[in-house]
Amino acid sequence: LLFGIFVAFNFMQQNKWEKSYRIAIGKYYKMSPDEAAKTTRFDGTCYFDEMVSPVNVGIRLSKGEKIYAVFENLSLMAYKRTGGFGFGGIFLRKKVAPAIYLRGGLGKFGLSKSLQADAVGTLYVTNKGIFYDGDKKNIKLAWDKIMRETINSDSIQLEKSNGSPVLLNGYIDPNEAAIMTLTGQLYESL
C-alpha cells in the first residue's frame, strides 16, 4: 500500500514537472499556458531570440558566447567500483574417487560498479555549448559534439558523439530546462 502511494506521488510530481516544462517552452512560441500544456510537439515560429536575455554570472567566456541557463548543485554521475566483488558463471563438479573431485567451468570475476557522484557543481548552457563547473571535475562540450540531450525533473543526460554519456543528477528547473532545449534546437537550425 505504501509503495503504491509512493509510486502514485512520484507519477503526479513527474506529470506536474512535464506540464510546467511544456508551458515554459510554449511561452517562447507565444502559446497560451493551456494550449502549451497539451502540446507534445512544438512547431511554428519560435521567438526565443527576442524573449530571452543572457545571464551574467561573472565568468569570462569566448567572444560572442552568452550564458542563457544555469543549473546549480548538480551531481556529475559516473560508474565507480564499490569495493564489492562480482562472481558468476557455470561450474561442474564430478566425483572421481572418494574425496577427489574434478572441477571445471566458465566464470567471470570482477569488482562491481555502481553509479556514484563524481563531482558537484553548476551546469551553464551557452549559445555555443554547455560547460559543467564542478568541484572535482569540469566538462566543456560544444553543441556539435552533443547528439541528444534528455531532460527530466531530476536529471540531464547528454549523449556525446563519442564516449560515454554525461549524466547530471539534481533538481532541474523546468524554465531553465526549456531554455536549454530551445538553445539546442536553435543550434540545430543554424
What would you call each of these model-derived segments?
Residues 4-7, 17-122:
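Anionic N-terminal interaction surfaces
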Residues 10, 14-23, 27-28, 81, ...:
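Acidic, Ser/Thr- and proline-rich intrinsically disordered linker/docking segments
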